[in-house]
Amino acid sequence: MQPRVLLIAALLVLLASARALEAEDPSLLGLMQGYMQHATKTAQDTLTSVQESQVAQRARDWMNDGFSSLKDYWSTFKGKLSGFWDSASEVQTTAASDAS
């Protein structure tokens, strides 16, 4: 073969491979865009999940604090009521022994 024919054949092969690479670039770009969209959605979903988890934790803490305060209030009320009940019983016992 003549050197010109080899040179032209090599040039045609290079042009054909360059065209093939150009055809792959948009699909590679599309693939990367799809990957980035998926990664963005995953990050957003994770962030939303974490925020919802934090809100749920705050709600649980608020409920626990409320129940704790209610139990403290009930304990105080019960203590005062039982103290009143005990003193009322003593008054009745004392009054009954004085009457005898």
Curated annotation (Swiss-Prot):
Coiled coil region boundaries: none
Annotated keywords: Chylomicron, Glycoprotein, Lipid degradation, Lipid metabolism, Lipid transport, Secreted, Sialic acid, Signal, Transport, VLDL
Region of interest (Lipid-binding), ranges: 68-100
Example GO molecular function: lipase inhibitor activity
Modification comment: The most abundant glycoforms are characterized by an O-linked disaccharide galactose linked to N-acetylgalactosamine (Gal-GalNAc), further modified with up to 3 sialic acid residues. Less abundant glycoforms are characterized by more complex and fucosylated glycan moieties. O-glycosylated on Thr-94 with a core 1 or possibly core 8 glycan.
A cellular-component GO term for this protein: chylomicron
Highest taxon in the source lineage: Eukaryota
Family annotation (InterPro entries): Apo-CIII, Apo_CIII_sf
Single biological process term from Gene Ontology: triglyceride homeostasis
Cellular compartment(s): Secreted
Glycosylation positions in this chain: 94
Disulfide bridge partners, by residue number: none
Site (May interact with the LDL receptor): 41
Database matches in Pfam families: Apo-CIII (PF05778)
Chain ranges passing through the membrane: none
Family: Belongs to the apolipoprotein C3 family.
Function: Component of triglyceride-rich very low density lipoproteins (VLDL) and high density lipoproteins (HDL) in plasma. Plays a multifaceted role in triglyceride homeostasis. Intracellularly, promotes hepatic very low density lipoprotein 1 (VLDL1) assembly and secretion; extracellularly, attenuates hydrolysis and clearance of triglyceride-rich lipoproteins (TRLs). Impairs the lipolysis of TRLs by inhibiting lipoprotein lipase and the hepatic uptake of TRLs by remnant receptors.
Identification of the protein by name: Apolipoprotein C-III
Gene: APOC3
